Each structure stands twice: as C-alpha cells, then as structure tokens.
UniProtKB/Swiss-Prot annotation:
Organism, scientific name: Salmonella paratyphi C (strain RKS4594)
EC number: 5.4.3.8
Keyword Nucleotide-binding: no
Subunit architecture: Homodimer.
Enzyme class per UniProt: isomerase
Full protein name: Glutamate-1-semialdehyde 2,1-aminomutase
Family: Belongs to the class-III pyridoxal-phosphate-dependent aminotransferase family. HemL subfamily.
C-alpha cells in the first residue's frame, strides 16, 4: 500500500469519510485521495514523493501559486507579534481600505472566516434590510453549507447526488426559491409569484460549482433589472471569482453593480478569510450600528489579515490577470485540439483564471441541465489517467479548475501533451 492509502485508512477511522471536506475524498471519481506533504509554485507533492502540476490551487485561493514568499513572510512576521487578540487592529483597517479600493461597489466591508460565513451573513443582512424572508438562488450553484443554501446546490452536493441535505428543515427550505441559471424567465416567474416576499437574489457571476459555466450576456444585467423592479437586493457571490476573473471581480468584468458582494478564497491568500460588503445604507444595518446581528471570534485575526493583505497587493500588480487569461486560454484551446484529434467530444469553458472540462456532444454548456447531460464516467477515467501523468485536476466533474500565475508555458504544454496521451487511451 502507498503512504496515501495507509493514511486514508487511518483517517477513515477518525474523521467522517477520512476528510474534512467531502470532495477531497475522491467520491466523485473513485479511488484513494492523495495526501499532500507540501506545495510550491504550480506543484503539489504527495506523501509518496510524487509531484503534480496543480490545477486545483486549494480550490481557488492560490492564484499566485503555492508558498508565495510575500504571503509566507507576511504570515511569519505577523505571527511573531501574536496569533489572535480579540480586539481591533490596524491591519483590519488597512485590509478594509484595500478591499474597498479594489472593489468599488463595496462602500463598507465586514471580515469573516469563510465563504459560507460571508454568504450566510449577507443573506441575513438582506432579509433584515428588506424585511422579507424569501431568497432566490440558482440550480447547481453553491454558496456554502448554510441551511437555506443547501437546496439544489452545486459543488459537493452534486457529487454526492443529493439535491437537498438531510438535516435541513422543510420550514427553512421553503423560503429558498430555485431558478435556472442563465434563464431570466424563471427568475421573473418567481418574482411575479412572490412580488413582496423576496429579499434578494444570490448568484455566482460565473457558476463555478457545477464546473465552470459563464453567464449569458443578458443574464446578470437582467438580474439587476429584476431586483430593481421588485425591490430586492442583488448579492453577487464572488468567493470564487473575486480577484481572479478580474481585479475588481466578475462584476467588473461583466459590468453589473450588486448591492452586496461576498468574497473568499483569494482574499485570504490561503488563510481562512471571507468578507461581505456593499452599499453603505445596507451595511449600516449590521450590528453594532444596526439591528442585524453578526459576529466571529476569529474574524479579522491578524495572521489572516496579514496573509490577505500581502496576497491582494501582489494580485493588484499590472499584468497578473492578463497572464492568467493567456495561460487559461492556451490550456483550454490545447485540450480541445488534443481531443478533436482523436474524435473525443469536448467543451472547455473558461473565464479569466477559471476553466471547466466537459465531455459532451453539445456545442455549448450554459446551464445545470447541460452540465448534468455530460459524460461523468468518461471524466472519471480522464481524471485518473491524468493523475498518473502527474496532472492534478479537480476530483469531480462538477468543480472548476484554477490557473495560477506560477504556471509556466512548459507546464501548460506538458499538460496538453499528457491529455493527448490520455485521449489516445480512451
């Protein structure tokens, strides 16, 4: 047995499923998950000593690559002054200034510890501000594991084949209305059925939890218009897309103005950080200035703020997003060309530093139904054969892949060459 197999066997006796987040268990592809010893740049190194070109990037945060010296040094320096104070710090103010400067639609921002906390808190705030209970989300989109959001969710929920999680009371779920991503007709129908009851729409501007599904040109502007028409707030969940699709996020890339924005992943540089923010009048409803309660013992802790501040300063440097886009486009085009050479039907969606691989006869993949029609079994075989080639992709047909600026042209070419060998075997 390999060391990963031994560790996984031991872990399953102590940790449910052997992992602390379900998708890591390789449930969506089968087999034994890799246990990682270290990471550097664009590479992961497992406990058995094998190196992999990494396109998971810790599920999105590692836009600069692993073990970036600026982030590492910032964490070490901050740790020397103490790990957590439970009191305000100057770095929290500097971080808030930086985030609100980079994302102009955020007049104010509140730091939390995860993307789930960010979306959960933003929805509570929207409900409190509007005095309404119902929310709209989209089929196949994932916004964390809060009860009200585990309704027809994406990400790990799709991998497990569960449209709703046990443990979510029907009384909670009834306030969550699920519409079809990229379908404004379904959204208008929901508003017309509940014109005075919907507090907000929450949406991934690029759906990254049913793989990678970009919005159609009219979709996000249409959501903005419907929210304005019916007096609801628009929450854009940029946990995945923020600082990756563009410096100011997908909202800037697609030209839509939300009322609230949720951030995560890149904002922490690899540390557990989330944030939500937006219009000043809405944020003023948050405690302690307003009646909507939200709190967190470790929110804004100095280590996480130092990591995030260092990361965002690096991400804001000129040329970062152009490089991400060029590398991702090269990978997507190369994979499609390699598949076409042997007659394998393949679609690779990509936006900025995100991409999604779909084995499908369809010409486009634009919604949940398109994603579910793809050949998941072929993806499973592709994943394992690529792993043997030293390429680490997301271990699920329903998860996006992530590029970093640490990936080189050689890494991209080696990945395409590996895919060409794998396609020849399929």
């Amino acid at each position: 047995m390999s060391k990963s197999e031994n560790l996984y066997s031991a872990a399953r006796e102590l940790i449910p499923g052997g992992v602390n987040s379900p998708v890591r268990a390789f449930t969506g592809v089968g087999g034994t998950p890799l246990f990682i010893e270290k990471a550097d740049g664009a590479y992961l190194y497992d406990v058995d000593g094998k190196a992999y070109i990494d396109y998971v990037g810790s599920w999105g945060p590692m836009v600069l690559g692993h073990n970036h010296p600026a982030i590492r040094n910032a964490v070490i320096e901050a740790a020397e002054r103490g790990l957590s104070f439970g009191a305000p710090t100057e770095m929290e103010v500097k971080m808030a200034e930086l985030v609100t400067n980079l994302v102009p639609t955020m007049d104010m921002v509140r730091m939390v510890n995860s993307g789930t906390e960010a979306t959960m808190s933003a929805i509570r705030l929207a409900r409190g501000f509007t005095g309404r209970d119902k929310i709209i989300k989209f089929e196949g989109c994932y916004h964390g594991h809060a009860d009200c959001l585990l309704v027809k969710a994406g990400s790990g929920a799709l991998t497990l084949g569960q449209p709703n999680s046990p443990g979510v009371p029907a009384d909670f779920a009834k306030h969550t209305l699920t519409c079809t991503y990229n379908d404004l007709t379904s959204v208008r129908a929901a508003f017309e059925q509940y014109p005075q009851e919907i507090a907000c729409i929450i949406v991934e501007p690029v759906a990254g939890n049913m793989n990678c599904v970009p919005p159609l040109p009219e979709f996000l502007p249409g959501l903005r218009a419907l929210c304005d028409e019916f007096g609801a707030l628009l929450i854009i969940d940029e946990v995945m897309t923020g600082f990756r699709v563009a410096l100011a996020g997908a909202q800037d890339y697609y030209g839509v103005v939300p009322d609230l924005t949720c951030l995560g992943k890149i904002i922490g540089g690899g540390m557990p950080v989330g944030a939500f923010g937006g219009r000043r009048d809405v944020m003023d409803a948050l405690a302690p200035t307003g009646p909507v309660y939200q709190a967190g013992t470790l929110s804004g802790n100095p280590i996480a703020m130092a990591a995030g501040f260092a990361c965002l300063n690096e991400v804001a440097q000129p040329g970062i997003h152009e490089t991400l886009d060029e590398l991702t486009t090269r990978l997507a085009e190369g994979l499609c060309e390699a598949a076409q050479e042997v007659g394998i039907p393949l679609v690779v969606n990509h936006v900025g530093g995100m991409f999604g691989i779909f084995f499908t006869d369809a010409e486009t993949v634009t919604c949940y139904q398109d994603v579910m029609a793809c050949d998941v079994e072929r993806f499973k075989r592709f994943f394992h054969l690529m792993l043997e080639e030293g390429v680490y992709l997301a271990p699920s047909a329903f998860e996006a892949g992530f590029m970093s600026v640490a990936h080189s042209e050689e890494d991209i070419n080696n990945t395409i060459d590996a895919a060409r060998r794998v396609f020849a075997k399929q």
